[in-house]
Amino acid sequence: MQTQAHPLEPFFRQAVRNSYEGKLGLRDPDVTGYVAHLLCDFSEADHLFSVRDANGHPVEELDAMILASDPVNGDASSFDAERAVRKHIGDYALFVAGMFPEATEPERRRRKQPSLADLIHAGKESYYIVSQFNLFEYEKEAPLFARLSDSFERCILGLTLIRDELGLRKSLMLPPPVN
């Protein structure tokens, strides 16, 4: 679906495929390709908070992102802008819930971090909304976002498995400590 433009894409494609297909039985090349591309995109920290407020500042809170997606009562200037922000919310929720589940722990929630349930709800809902943009230039992508919404929890689990595997590899590759 996406073109391979990022140097980490082959690595992430294989890691996602191993996790999603090999461990979870989720055999959907469009989903695995999309998630691999998402990992590449969010490997650049500035992309994690690409939604901007009216003053151009990054929007870092989930509730504020959701408000920014509203074309009637929020900051979205059009339905295309709503789709773009909702797509980002789905991506953000999937990434944070799968790769940084500790961010949803209660002590972090006191600092306005969303719970895992909040991320799942926002991610599923956002991908569903994106899937409803199913005309014209969005017609081909709409079914992918419907599948991402339907399998959101499995996609989170797949990312958590990737995270765990990467952590294991890192510990195996570290040089022995110097005394």
Describe each model-derived feature in a short phrase.
Residues 1-173:
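Terminal low-complexity "docking" segments
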Residues 176-179:
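Helix-rich, well-folded core regions that mediate interactions or catalysis
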